[in-house]
A protein has these predicted regions:
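Flavin-dependent oxidoreductase catalytic core characteristic
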Residues: 1-137
Length: 137
């Protein structure tokens, strides 16, 4: 455990750490392909309950089935990013209030989504409930 904490600060500043992590995910997928199938099966149940996530899930699954390993390696960051965002959305749908889950989904998948705050349509997200929840703790 001490070694993990000792190396943690280095990981965030080490040049290329994001690429290394993404390539590690690809290696794990190649080494134990049944694990990604278990993960996708788990995502499928929840993703099917939301039209946006259902579409993203189908696209991600098609990408994994039709892309060769060299191309997957080239696009490792995009692939892992999609996996992570889908995992976050699935977990929020399962365990968070619906307005929180929907706010996250809209902020990541809507036509106006962006990497900064403020890229949503005003009526798409229950901002008042999200703020009330954040400040009531």
């Amino acid at each position: 455990m001490a070694r993990i904490f000792k190396e943690a600060p280095v990981n965030t500043i080490w040049e290329g750490s994001g690429n290394v992590m993404c390539l590690d995910v690809l290696r794990a997928m190649q080494r134990e392909p049944e694990l990604i199938q278990v993960l996708l099966q788990d995502f499928a149940r929840t993703a099917a309950t939301h039209p946006i996530l259902s579409s993203e899930f189908d696209g991600l699954q098609q990408l994994l089935q039709t892309t060769n390993s060299n191309d997957l390696q080239f696009m490792a960051r995009a692939l892992v990013s999609r996996l992570v965002i889908l995992a976050q959305a699935v977990l929020l749908l399962r365990y968070a209030p619906s307005f929180v889950a929907e706010g996250f989904i809209q902020s990541r998948y809507s036509a106006l989504h962006g990497q900064v705050v403020g890229m949503l349509k005003p009526k798409q997200v229950d901002v008042a409930s999200i703020l009330q929840r954040a400040f009531s703790a």
